[in-house]
Amino acid sequence: LHKEYRRQRQMCIRDRVYWLRDRRYIMNLIVVPVAGVLTVLPLLVAGVPLEIAALVPVPVMALFFGWLPHNDVAYDSTALWTHVASGVRGIPDRLGRLVPVILVAVPVLAIAVPLTLLWIDDWRPLLPLTGLGASLLLSALGFSSIVSVIAPYAVSRPGDSPFQQPQRPTSRGAYGPAAAFLGAIVVSVPTIWLLVLTMLEGSQFAPATFWAGLATGIAVFAIGVGVGGRLSLI
């Protein structure tokens, strides 16, 4: 057990170094909050009330943060062989790749949620918004843990521009990301429905929305890490 923990810790540290030094990772981290905020503008232009439109960026950011590691293995580049030789496989490998994303996503979302509620001057959506964010983030991480094993695709090399993408001879670059992205949305539909009920019917549905989102996220995350870890051993 201690050996597995040490391997997981080593994997986590190496991934954190990549996230801090590799501009491909840094660009991803910058794009997520920006994309979340930009979703408000077209909604406001379309006439969506501010108190509704302002709730959209948090779930969007949670979903994209969870989706980021769906191709994490490909970003390893030549360092992958050092990783393979070290014997880090299975669940420690999966968790080690996801922890750096969680360490970034959780503080960002923890700041974004209260700022959103302060902006609209309404704290009633606190539990529903937190529950939906947890569902989307953890579910996307779970699906990404599987997709990164079964459907990796070519990415730009270390040092290349993040906007420079290589040719991809297969459809992995299409169905892999889509599976992780849409999968998280599908399993979060019950939580989304409860959030809508909370907004329409009142705060009596708020606790149910929070716990449903948290339970969904944890369950999909655990299953995804377990399945991804097992597949990485094959």
Which residues does each PLM region occupy?
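Actinobacteria-biased recognition of intrinsically disordered, low-complexity terminal regions
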Residues: L1, V220-I234
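Single conserved hydrophobic/aromatic residue that forms the stacking wall/gate
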Residues: L1-R9, I13
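Interfacial transmembrane-helix starts/ends
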Residues: R16, L20, I91-I102
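Generic beta-strand/beta-sheet core signal
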Residues: D22, L29-V32, D76, H83, ...
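Hydrophobic alpha-helical transmembrane segments of multi-pass membrane transport/permease proteins
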Residues: R24-L44, L55-A62, V187, T191
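Membrane-spanning alpha-helical segments of multipass transporters and channels
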Residues: A53-P69, V73-A79, L95-L117, D122-I218, ...
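Short helix-to-coil transition segments within interhelical loops
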Residues: V84-R89
